[in-house]
Amino acid sequence: MQFKSLLVSALAAASTALAQRSCGTPSPTEEQTEVAQRLQFNEENARVAGNATRLAPVTVNVYWHVIATSNSVSGGYLSQATLDKQLDVLNEAYAPHDIQFAQAGADWTINSNWASDRAELAMKRALRKGTYADLNVYFVPGTPYLGYAYFPTTVTTGSSAFYYDGVVILSDSVPGGSLSQYNLGHTATHEVGHWLGLYHTFEGYQCGGNGDYVSDTPFESEEAYGCEIGRDTCPSQAGDDPVTNYMDYSDDPCFTHFTTGQETRMHSYWTAYRASYQ
């Protein structure tokens, strides 16, 4: 997976040309995978010992930022009604895991340079709101990806890492967008999963090792596209490929769930890195 800033395409080419899901979330660093491995160890020990505790429900404040080239849908402009639908999609996906989202604010900016995803840090420095516990979502029409996010980590408020934090979403992938495979709003579901600490289900691209560092997601040696129900790229390991998991690359209609282990992981990361900022 390539880092977001390595690929920037022309505004027009970044929308309807996408035939497969693409995620520009940076690969986890060695430090981040060490944290994930430690969390997996602690979570699995608690589960085996029978003393795993249900963490308190989490409500995340969301700040929407719509960046467009004009006040038209073709320019990337999204209405408040569309933002409301996107919020509903997130809440439906995350509610079974005691995570909910509440709109804290929304703003609209006409800026062709920002809309092309060529000035990420400048855009975020100007628009970001709230604390490290608050989710900032930036809708842009010109990113070469369906979306990207940043994993939770230790940050100093006001630092570049603080401003980079958040989720960037291709405008056409919102509910009712022009991308027929990806217009149910689950690009945001997927990227918010990263923001809460989850890796791709195919992390590592192999049938052994640590995978995504979550014990109950089956191993998967490559990403899944479309909706390949019953696919098994790791026949020597238990379970078919988790193609309906939100953290795979399947089409939006194929997605159905997070696992119990992923739920625990999101709460673990929230407690470790974001909860104290509320």
Swiss-Prot record:
GO terms for biological process, alphabetical: proteolysis
Protein localization: Secreted
UniProt entry tagged with the keyword Cell division: no
Binding sites annotated in the UniProt record for Zn(2+): 190, 194
Signal sequence residues: 1-19
Residues glycosylated per entry: 51
InterPro entries hit by this protein: MetalloPept_cat_dom_sf (IPR024079), Peptidase_M43 (IPR008754)
PROSITE patterns: ZINC_PROTEASE (PS00142)
Pfam families for the chain: Peptidase_M43
UniProt keyword annotations, A-Z: Disulfide bond, Glycoprotein, Hydrolase, Metal-binding, Metalloprotease, Protease, Secreted, Signal, Zinc
Active site: 191
Gene Ontology MF: a single term: metal ion binding
E.C. numbers: 3.4.24.-
GO CC aspect terms: extracellular region
Keyword Magnesium: no
Disulfide bonds: 227-254
Family the entry assigns: Belongs to the peptidase M43B family.
PANTHER family listed in its UniProt record: METALLOPROTEASE MEP1 (AFU_ORTHOLOGUE AFUA_1G07730)-RELATED (PTHR47466:SF1), PTHR47466
Biological role: Secreted metalloproteinase that allows assimilation of proteinaceous substrates.
Name recorded for this polypeptide: Extracellular metalloprotease GLRG_06511
